């Protein structure tokens, strides 16, 4: 990648030229088959994601074009959200998108159930998990439409400082 190729990436990410060069090398190392994009298996070799039960959701969000793989641009833009320079709103939007599986701008009862199921596995019975989901929606759905909007989500996590935990230190 020449200087021309990295300039737009600097403008649409939170990384400077040096960080982009490092990330380019890391991407190429992860791209074992040399295809120019990361498969789920290649992506899973990132130590930061190996123990994360939501790794498939992270990959789905990074994969903006929905082709099942993460190309370099998607990788940089995705990782950029976890930069220490990333802003709170961007991090909250990413966290919201983990739950908003169909990308309609809302977290439905079913979506919340699916994501929580990924996190708790079989530690709770489905009926117990459904009760938690129902109560969560009921309590935080301020406009009564049966789903959680981005603003309602932000109201819930506002005081948790979750955005400060959404940082990869050694990218």
Swiss-Prot record:
Main location class: cytoplasm
GO molecular function: calcium ion binding; calcium-dependent protein serine/threonine phosphatase regulator activity; phosphatase binding
Pfam families in the cross-refs: EF-hand_7
GO terms under cellular component: calcineurin complex; endoplasmic reticulum; sarcomere; striated muscle dense body
Region annotated tax-6/calcineurin A binding, chain positions: 131-136
PROSITE patterns recorded: EF_HAND_1 (PS00018), EF_HAND_2 (PS50222)
Entry keyword annotation includes Iron-sulfur: no
Gene ablation phenotype (knockout): Mutants grow slowly and show uncoordinated or lethargic movements. Increased lifespan. Body is small and slender with a transparent appearance resulting from a thinner cuticle. Reduced number of progeny associated with a retention of late stage embryos in the uterus, a reduced sperm count which appears smaller and smoother and with smaller pseudopods. In addition, serotonin-induced egg laying is delayed. Increased susceptibility to nicotine-mediated paralysis. Impaired CO2 avoidance. Increased number of puncta positive for autophagy marker LGG-1.
Coiled coil: none
Location relative to the cell: Cytoplasm
UniProtKB keywords: Calcium, Cytoplasm, Endocytosis, Metal-binding, Repeat
Residues holding Ca(2+) 2: 63, 65, 67, 69, 74
Quaternary assembly: Forms a complex composed of a calmodulin-dependent catalytic subunit tax-6 (also known as calcineurin A) and a regulatory Ca(2+)-binding subunit cnb-1 (also known as calcineurin B) which confers calcium sensitivity.
Protein name as annotated: Protein phosphatase 2B regulatory subunit cnb-1
Lineage: Eukaryota, Metazoa, Ecdysozoa, Nematoda, Chromadorea
